[in-house]
């Protein structure tokens, strides 16, 4: 018997197909195909540029050059205490060429005209332009604006103008020895331009630009090399242009009248040590320093050492009074005497003089006897304290420290001769500074060419009472009977001292070469101004300090007091009173 089965096999569900991952060979194939397509595009683009747009792109590339252009920092302006500009930088243009990119030389006519405009010989221009390996060569720097425009009108290819700054000195030779000058790159070379270089110069910047073949900037480009310039600091000096003008003019008159070799004047603010004027003659134009010789460029007030002669005597007298070695009532025997074989004498013989008389008559004998009351070492230390033999650190090239030999090397006569200004040397600026110890009530002040906001700290040399006493004694020098009456200023008590020194030439003191000095202050009771004048080697109309340097001192002192608005301290004489017209 057959049995029918009811069994039906169960069907398994259909498995879902899973895609096989791409093999490494597949990925490589894909990348290669993509690169092939990209490469084909590049080839196509290159063919397009080489054929369809070649001429256009070549012309544009030839006409545009990427350059890094200097952005010069503007050098700081220098002005006097009242704002008169003494030195400034003005925009100018300089011309350079790119011989490397020149396809052909400028025509003969163009070169001839360019030569005329920039004042460079044609053969020099041609030699510059024939240096084909160079991509930069200066043709002429700091052109006059009108000249620059005429050069541009020539349409010279591969001649490029660069913006620069040129230093100008509006006052010309008036401030030459103080301000100094810069080189063509704007770096200080002498005077305050050199000593204040770090403050004045600033820091140059840079800009990446696109220029055409004529050198014109067609675009500025973004670049990490771009940097804004940092301009220099403006400097306000202590100098007063009005007083400087007066001092310079009077100095030149004196040098001419006495047919002298040279002259120097220094004017100080007696209360602060600020330098109000400093002038030398001969001088030079700092706008054209290359035309000046070494004699004209020398800042004699700072570099030249002088033996001060009798101008040193007030300090010796002050020291003796300050130490109690003498008093105003003592009379000294002032007849000639000897130290060993060496005589000490005065121009005129005075049997005896009190301290006032020693000052007024400028007695070598009396001053030397006061100096002899101190040891050599003590006098050496005293002169050193006054700044003799010590550099002032003014920053001026060639600044002298003066000369003060060690006391152990002094011969017996030298302590005496130093007391009346022989055997020690200092600059006129150092001498003027020493006088601040008298005008500032015994305190020696530092000097400054920059305007001071606060009074400086000085060094005490004498007691206040001593300084006042000596100032009063020094008024007698400009009064009748004194050696400095030529320096008297009407309406003011002027304290002063004359100095006449023979010059040391070829190992001996010359009989016919002198330095005439006159230095003083006013008003004597409350000094505001110190004026120091030296005339070097006067050959006409006298040689004594009072005769030669006294008259310019008088004019400069009187004018300075008037400029500063200082009222007279005593009645004017009838001759000085001007009747209104």
Curated annotation (Swiss-Prot):
Name of the molecule in the record: Probable peptidoglycan D,D-transpeptidase PenA
A GO cellular component annotation in the UniProt record: plasma membrane
Gene: penA
GO annotation terms (biological process): cell wall organization; division septum assembly; FtsZ-dependent cytokinesis; peptidoglycan biosynthetic process; proteolysis; regulation of cell shape; response to antibiotic
GO molecular function annotation: penicillin binding; peptidoglycan glycosyltransferase activity; serine-type D-Ala-D-Ala carboxypeptidase activity
Pathway(s) per entry: Cell wall biogenesis; peptidoglycan biosynthesis
Catalytic activity line of the entry: Preferential cleavage: (Ac)2-L-Lys-D-Ala-|-D-Ala. Also transpeptidation of peptidyl-alanyl moieties that are N-acyl substituents of D-alanine
Keyword Hydrolase: yes
Membrane topology type: Single-pass membrane protein
Annotated TM spans: 28-48
Main localization category: membrane
Effect on the protein of changing residue 551 to L: In strain: CDC84-060384
Physiological role: Catalyzes cross-linking of the peptidoglycan cell wall at the division septum.
Coiled-coil ranges (or none): none
Keywords from the UniProt entry: Antibiotic resistance, Carboxypeptidase, Cell cycle, Cell division, Cell inner membrane, Cell membrane, Cell shape, Cell wall biogenesis/degradation, Hydrolase, Membrane, Peptidoglycan synthesis, Protease, Septation, Transmembrane, Transmembrane helix
Catalytic residues as annotated in Swiss-Prot or TrEMBL: 310 (acyl-ester intermediate)
Taxonomic source organism: Neisseria gonorrhoeae
Miscellaneous comment as given in the Swiss-Prot or TrEMBL entry: This protein was sequenced in penicillin-sensitive strains LM306, and FA19, and in penicillin-resistant strains CDC84-060384, CDC84-060418 and CDC77-124615. The sequence shown is that of strain LM306.
Known outcome of mutating residue 551 to S: In strain: CDC77-124615
Broadest EC class assigned to this enzyme: hydrolase
Record family assignment: Belongs to the transpeptidase family. FtsI subfamily.
UniProt effect for mutating residue 516 to G: In strain: CDC84-060418, CDC77-124615 and CDC84-060384
Effect of residue 541 to N: In strain: FA19 and CDC84-060418
Compartments (UniProt record): Cell inner membrane
Matches recorded under HAMAP family: FtsI_transpept (MF_02080)
